[in-house]
Amino acid sequence: MKLAVYSTKQYDKKYLQQVNESFGFELEFFDFLLTEKTAKTANGCEAVCIFVNDDGSRPVLEELKKHGVKYIALRCAGFNNVDLDAAKELGLKVVRVPAYDPEAVAEHAIGMMMTLNRRIHRAYQRTRDANFSLEGLTGFTMYGKPAGVIGTGKIGVAMLHILKGFGMRLLAFDPYPSAAALELGVEYVDLPTLFSESDVISLHCPLTPENYHLLNEAAFDQMKNGVMIVNTSRGALIDSQAAIEALKNQKIGSLGMDVYENERDLFFEDKSNDVIQDDVFRRLSACHNVLFTGHQAFLTAEALTSISQTTLQNLSNLEKGETCPNELV
C-alpha cells in the first residue's frame, strides 16, 4: 500500500519509518497540510495519514476519492476535523489512534499546572537576568485542594492517578463514568458543581458540536475566583475571547493551553520571525499568568512509537479486510 503522510515533521518521519520496517508500506511524506488544493498530491495512494490541523472536510474527501484514496488514517485521537458523514457516503474508511500514551499527555498537563502554580516560567526569566526576588511568585499547596477533571477516558484517568498522588480531592465530570476512575475514589459531579468547587480544572474530553466552547462566559461565572485551568485536549473547548475577559477580572487566576481554537495557522511552525496576526492569541500570550505550549503534550518517544504502530496496524487491518477496532466509519 502507498501512503501519503501530511503535516510531517522530522519526528513523525523518524518513528513512522522505524515502525514501517515491519509493515513494508510505501510512505510518501509531505510537510504541508492536507487541503482541497493539496489533495491532488495523494494521487496514486490508497491511503492518507493526517494530523489534527489537516482538513478532512467534504470537499477534501471528494478530491481524495477522485485520486483513488480509500483510507483516511488519523494519527491522533481527535477526529473533529474529518466529516465522517461525508466519508461514509463516499465509501472512505476512517481510522484513528484512540489512546497512544495517555500518561504522556497527563504528565504534560501536570507540568503546566506546576509551572503556573509556582510561577516557574516567571522565575526562569528573572534568574536569567540575575533577579532573585521572590515577589509575585507565591503559589499554593496542592495537597488537599479540589481538582476537577472533565473527561475520564484513558488520559483523564491517567491525570487522576497523578492528582491522587498529590493528595488532592478528585472531582470529575463525564457522561460515561469510568470504573477505573471510581476505583481511585473520584467523586463524579455535574458541571456546575465541578466549576464551583474546583481550584484546578483540567480538560481531557474530545471536541464535539455539543461541547464547543464548553468553557464560556457562563461557565467562568460559576467558577471560583482565581481558578486554574489547563487544556491539553482541544482548543475550541475554551471560548478564547471569554477567557480574556475572565483573566481581566481575575476570575481565572492562571491558564495553561497546549491547544488553541485557532491554532491551525500558528502551531507546529516556526513563527518567530513573523508578526502574529491573531489578536486574541497575542492578548492571551501577553498575560504573565497564561502559559502556552504548541500542542506538544503528546510529544514523547514512547507516544510517537505507539502512534506510528497503531496507525500502520490500522491500515494493515483495513488492507487485509480484517476488523479494525479503531475504525470510525
Where are these regions (language model features)?
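Rossmann-like dinucleotide-binding domain for NAD(H)/NADP(H)
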Residues: 226, 235-329
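An N-terminal-biased, well-structured beta-alpha scaffold segment characteristic
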Residues: 1-95, 216
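A short helix->loop->beta-strand "cap" motif at the edges of active sites that frequently abuts
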Residues: 66-71, 90-92, 168, 225-227, ...
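Phosphate-binding beta-alpha-beta segment of Rossmann-like dinucleotide-binding domains, i.e.
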Residues: 90-92, 98-146, 158-161, 165
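Short glycine-/small-residue-rich Rossmann-like dinucleotide-binding loops
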Residues: 52-53, 199, 205-207, 233-234, ...
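Rossmann-like dinucleotide/phosphate-binding beta-alpha-beta segment
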Residues: 135-225
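Glycine-rich nucleotide-phosphate-binding loops and adjacent flexible coil segments
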Residues: 230
